[in-house]
């Protein structure tokens, strides 16, 4: 089976699983193929998370990270805890990032606009330059291919415009209409 045929098979399989989500599926696959990011907007219960999980689950060998963001989300939840033993023994300030956003190829951040400014600011360089900047640490390359984000609302604060602009692909999903 050619690569093109495999791609169409994945797309058709996703379309059979997720009703009335053809455009969202196509945009999610385009995000993966182009290495860009996608924002999915819609009310609760329209399968935004399900869509991202279904698409990313079909990528073999990719490190996947997912997090529901809140105003209380701290950097350790996204980038891993500080290596306290390394800090105590050698004075090295670094994170244990295995399984975190810092090591992910694909990531899904749900309710992105609910995160606090500290989190949102670090996402600016991760989403654009694929670098994690933290005080006291050299910039760390992040192997991120595509970042998917979802929200029930559009950002109202003008300070969020820069991060919002990082999502070149956007999809507004609504409740399924067919019986």
Question: How would you describe each model-predicted region?
Answer:
Residues 6, 10, 21-24, 51, ...:
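Helical mechanochemical/support elements of P-loop NTPase systems and associated helical scaffolds
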Residues 29-71:
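Walker A/P-loop
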Residues 72-89:
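Conserved NTP-binding/hydrolysis module of P-loop NTPases
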Residues 4-43:
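Pre-Walker A (pre-P-loop) alpha-helix and adjacent loop at the N terminus of AAA/AAA+ ATPase modules
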Residues 27-30, 84-107:
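Conserved alpha-helical scaffold flanking the Walker A/P-loop in AAA+ ATPase domains
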Residues 66, 85-90, 106-122, 127-179:
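Canonical AAA+ ATPase core
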